[in-house]
Amino acid sequence: VEEQEATGIVVGVDGSPLSVEALRWAARLESGVGGPITAATAWQFPVMGLGMYRDKQWGPEDDARELLNQAIGDAYGGSPPRGLTTLIASGPAARVLIENSRGARLLVVGSRGLGGFARLMLGSVSAVCAEHAACPVLVVHAPTVKPAAGQAEDADAPARSWLA
């Protein structure tokens, strides 16, 4: 997987289960939207305690790359979509995604990331992206209703809520 600028579908990835699901949704939508999928993640240096990171082998960019590769593996196993690229950028996640939405046809994000406010229906990054992105935004939610015993799970539920 090579790194390059975003074009077709940009997917915000933070390692959360919903960002992995966002990667899966992007693969489902790729042929209809057109263009390749770019899995994008953002990193920042910690604000406090920079002195404790004196090990020159460690860096937040390396952690971001590892997180992104793990999420891609979780989403696609050993068969990522053809043409999948990655984008690892320094800065706040919302800013990175909004900047890269300018060259995209669709931005896909999970409704909740790894932030600390679990009671919110929409996370701060997904809310800011939905408001400011330069392209349409698909916010992927977790299924809210579990299928009854013996019934198949409705894989199109997030798409229906997006299209409604």
Label the model's feature ranges.
Residues 2-53, 100, 132, 143-145, ...:
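Small/aliphatic-rich secondary-structure junction motif
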Residues 8, 105-106:
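Structural motif
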Residues 56-67:
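A short acidic, glycine-rich active-site loop
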Residues 73, 95, 127:
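Active-site phosphate/pyrophosphate- and oxyanion-stabilizing loops and adjacent acidic/basic residues
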Residues 75-81:
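Short helix-capping segments at alpha-helix termini
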Residues 83-87:
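A non-catalytic structural micro-motif
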Residues 88-95:
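Charged docking surfaces used in two-component/phosphorelay signaling
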Residues 106-132, 146-149:
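Glycine-rich, Arg-bearing micro-motifs that act as flexible, cationic patches
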